[in-house]
Amino acid sequence: MLLASMSLASCDLFEMDNYEEPKETIHGAVVDAETGDSILTDQGSEGIRVRLTQLDYSENASHNPDFYCMADGSFQNTKIFEGYYNVRVDGPFIPLVRETDQGVPLANETKDVKIKGKTEVIFKVKPFLRVEFVGYPTVSNGQITAKVKVTRAISRDEFKSCVEPMG
């Protein structure tokens, strides 16, 4: 028993982390390229995903854990290490990274940024649909009622030219 406790006490579990706590911030928004309006979405794992890949940490860069936009299309992460990152968002819009089913690149609209202090990144995207409130939502007897108008945001031709080559 004594030997087990001595070996446990000497292990690396009790050493301090050799890195300072990350203090840099990335924040921004995902907006409609045509209207400038925020892209409204579900919040959480069904919404817009933000993916960071630190490019200057190692040759075999791996993705940081993904995080998600708020329902209004804005995002913020206040615990990032300073460095150069590739930033990408995925959601209900024409994908920023597109390639054929054979892996041939068609487009890469991600952003490479230096994150130091507070860094803002705005993505202008082409949503598949636009959702607009018609009038104001009302509340009656604890029930919220809202009317919305949903319209196609990109033409069929644009969809075919951007998405169909992906397979």
What feature does the model see in each segment?
Residues 35-60, 159-163:
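Short, ordered, surface-exposed loop/turn motifs in non-cytosolic proteins
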Residues 92-126:
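Structured interaction patches on ligand/partner-binding surfaces of diverse proteins
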Residues 55-74:
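Short, acidic Ser/Thr/Gly-rich low-complexity loop/linker segments typical of extracellular
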Residues 22-26, 142-146:
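Structural beta-strand segments of beta-rich domains
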Residues 24-33, 73:
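A short, amphipathic beta-strand motif
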Residues 73, 81-100:
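A short, solvent-exposed beta-strand micro-motif common in secreted/extracellular proteins
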Residues 6-10:
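C-terminal motif of bacterial Sec signal peptides marking the signal peptidase cleavage site
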Residues 16-18, 29-45, 153:
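Structural motif
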